[in-house]
């Protein structure tokens, strides 16, 4: 048996809930996993991304902050893929991505991210969003 078959067998043996996501830097492994077990949500981790995402046979992409391009994210979403950004740990970066079209943020600062997300939900008027955008632009 190969790695993917062993993984699927262990995944099923452990009765892991299919709401969990599985990701790897190895696209071929993820595409094979997607083909053999489409019920498992698969993702491709891309440390450095230039241009679009292509048409990988996975459910989502994970890009590093440095490589984030909003247009590429929107295109990926149009083709049915989710996009997550990692590892976002500063207040400034969390502020930026909470208001972005990404499907999720990977962070070590979970409490801070939740607080920022809640604050953005509470203060979400057009003026609030404008001021946040202005603040992020000035901070750069």
Q: PLM features: residue spans?
A:
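Short loop-to-alpha-helix "cap/lid" segments that border enzyme active sites
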Residues: 1-140
């Amino acid at each position: 048996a190969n790695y993917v078959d062993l993984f699927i067998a262990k995944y099923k043996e452990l009765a892991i809930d299919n709401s969990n996501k599985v990701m790897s830097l190895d696209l071929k492994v993820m595409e094979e996993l997607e083909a053999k077990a489409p019920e498992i949500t698969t993702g491709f981790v891309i440390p450095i991304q230039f241009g679009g995402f292509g048409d990988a046979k996975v459910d989502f992409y994970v890009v590093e902050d440095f490589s984030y391009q909003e247009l590429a994210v929107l295109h990926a979403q149009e083709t049915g893929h989710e996009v997550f950004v990692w590892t976002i740990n500063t207040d400034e970066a969390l502020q930026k991505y909470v208001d972005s079209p990404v499907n999720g943020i990977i962070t070590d600062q979970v409490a801070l991210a939740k607080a920022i997300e809640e604050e953005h939900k509470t203060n979400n008027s057009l003026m609030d969003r404008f001021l946040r955008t202005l603040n992020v632009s000035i901070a750069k």
